[in-house]
Every structure is written in structure tokens, then in C-alpha cells.
Amino acid sequence: MKKALIKDTFREIKKSFGRFISIFGIVLVGVAFFTGVKSSARYMKYSADTYFDNNNLFDLKMYSNVGFDDADIEKLGKTEGIDRIEGVTSIDVITNVHDNDETVQIFSYDFSSDDNLNKITLTEGRFPENPGECVIRDYGIAREPIELGTELAIKDDNLKSTSYKVVGKVSTPYYLSYQYDTTTVGSGKISDVLFISEDEFTGDRYTVLFATVKGAKDEYCYGDTYFDIVTPVKEKVIENADELSEKYAMLGGYTFYALDRNSHYSFVDYKNCGDRMDAIAKVFPAFFYLVAALVCLTTMTRMVDEQRGGIGTLKALGYNKISIAGKYITYALLASLAGGVLGCVLGLLTFPRIIFNAWNIVYTVADFTEVPQISMCGLAIMIAVLINVLATFASCFSMLTETPALLLRPKSPKNGKKVFLEHIPFIWKHFNFTKKVTARNILRYKKRFFMTITGIAG
């Protein structure tokens, strides 16, 4: 594009700044929604991954119908690829909560260590220091809480105490929401989760083993690479467990299960929430991009029509079609680039945090983790620029094919024609003059009509 046309382009931006801002604004909104909503899914999952890593969430959990002793833990802990393994005792019991009989799940926990697997974090109160004390999972505002100081009457042969006083509230990566595992006790639905000292259990066998896998923490836990590391180790654990079946053969019917995170409801549920946000991002911002294209098409068509004589003069002076079209394409390109860049910044700074905090009403993922989104921003800006450049080219293509002589003359008005409603006398004759003019304007100027319909639908 020649220097004179470049100057004329910037002069046109200054002269028609309102039009420039209209393209800039709709692109900004569209790109902000696309990058903000689309990146929210990634931010949510990476935040969960960081939370899981910081609190040592299990990679594998193991069950058997006879439980485990220390020798079993030692045996399975020697499996190639296992980093750490811990035994936990858990039971499901019925207690009275808020004047209702509800099922609670109780886990043993070593409160003397600050590096356990499935590490719990104190959010209120204190950890148990005396027999008959417990902490309860803090589920925020999702449901009516059990207050500190509440005495829970729990009678079970596996427990040394018959009641437990709630002295603290904790968060745990094992459960992210108030949806817990199912149980065969009571109604089959677990209402609350308690943690008590290991010494509070009467038995010396563990009901579940949790293990971490070497190198798994270095990978993104919702990615395929993570499971490529964990799955082979899970298979080796199952092979090693065959020797345990010989040990417990006399009991008859020995069963053993090794499960990864994909079998854990809370892990999968949070992933599905992120996937739903990703699905929304594929549809919702499309309306803004479509409106952006229509706004650009309408704006640039009007500009080209107004400058019909100027285009004819440029052609008469020897400027080729590409150079003349370049003026208007540059106009739309600059508006789209500016709106796209600012839209990316605003979208990434606002929407992910708002969406993350909104989901955190239900889920307890501690910290928001930021992840680079360069490729996504590039894609969002590229789509916006491409759509508007094509719309601009379409708006000036027909005029550029005309000769300078035709362009220097005023444009002939469109031939009058009836709209389809005029062929339906029963309807048309009931319209007053204003309604007839409105109907003709709507149905004859189809670009404006579809822009209005799309904007309202979006």
C-alpha cells in the first residue's frame, strides 16, 4: 500500500472514530468472552492439580475384603514405581445430625505428621488433642454446617469412644464437594466426613491403602501423560497382590482392588465441571464473533458507499484494486487487533477468577493457579481479525470491480419492490403508514435485519 493511502487510512480513522470504536468494541467483547471462558476450564483443572500436588492426593488406592496389615503394606510398597504408601482405617456409621439420623464416614489420621497422603488443612478450630475428639470436613456454605463443640454420639465396636466432640474443621483434597462416596450403611448416602486419631480405632488392620507413584506429581493430573505413568504401576500392584491371595487363601474368597483417580468421584466430578465450561466456550462466544462480522460488514459497507467518489478518483489516478481495498482492510485490521489484544487481557484478568470463585462455592480448591494462555490468545485474535478482514473485503469487492466513470457518478437508488407481506392483503392492509415503512426497512435491508436478529438471539 502506498504512503499516501497509509496516511489516508489513519486520517479516516480519526475522522470516523465512532465507527472504528464500534468494531473495536464488539471484537473486544467477543475475544474477552472467548479467552476468559475458554481459559477458565484450564485454570480450574490446573488449580486442582496444584492443590492435589501440594496436599499429596493419592495416585492409587487399594481395597481388599479382609483389610491389610503392616506386612501387606510393606509388600505392596516394594512394587516398582510406588513412591509412598500409607494405611488408613475408615468406617461408615450412623449418628444424629441436626435431629436426623445420618451416615458419616470416619477416617483415621496421623495428626502428629504434617506430610500425610491426602493431607488435611485446618480451616477453623484445632486438631484433636484428647480422646473422643474429632475434626470434620468443612464444606463451606453448600449445606448447614456442624458447629464446633457439637457432640456426636457414635457407637461402633471399632471405636474406643462412644461420642466425639467436633473441635475443628478441615479441607481435604480427597473430597472437593459435599458429594461423597456411596455406602451400604443407612440410606446409602454419606452426609459428613470425620477425622480421628489412629489410636481411636480398636483394631490393628487397615481398610484402605493410599499410594503415590514416582514421577506422577510432575505431570498434569488431568492429562494422558499422567495416566501413562500411573496405569503400569497399578497393573504391577495387582500382580503383586496375587501373593496376598495365597496368604489369605484359608479365609476363602479373597478379593483385591487397585484403583486410580479416574475411579474417584470427586476427581472426575471436578474434571467434568471444567469440561462443561470448555463446552460453553465453544458455543457462547460464537454469537459475539458473528455479531462482530455483521457489525464490521455493515460499518464498512456504509463507509465504502459514502466514499464511492473517492474510490473512483483513486482508480482514475492509477491505484490498483488491492491498494484501494488495503485502505479499508487496514482500517478493520487495526480495530480488530486493538480490540483483540485488549480483549485477551481483560478476559484473562476477569472471567477465570470470577468463574473459579463461583465454582468454589461448591468445591474446595484452595488456590487459583495461573497458566500461560499464549496460544489461545493468538487463536482468539486470529479468528477475530480473519472474520473482520473477510467481511471488509466482501463489503468493498463489488465496488472495486466497477469502472472509474461509474464510481464518479452518484449511485443509482435501488429499484422499488414489494416485500412479501404486501402480497398478503389480509395482513398488510391492517398496517398503518409507520408500520408499513418499518416492515419495508426491516425486510429490504437484510444485513441490518440479520445483525439485529443475531444480536438479540446472542
Labelled PLM ranges:
Residues 41, 45, 49, 392-405:
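Juxtamembrane/interface segments at transmembrane-helix termini
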Residues 8, 12-18, 294-334:
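Interfacial "coupling" helices/loops that link adjacent transmembrane helices in transporter permeases
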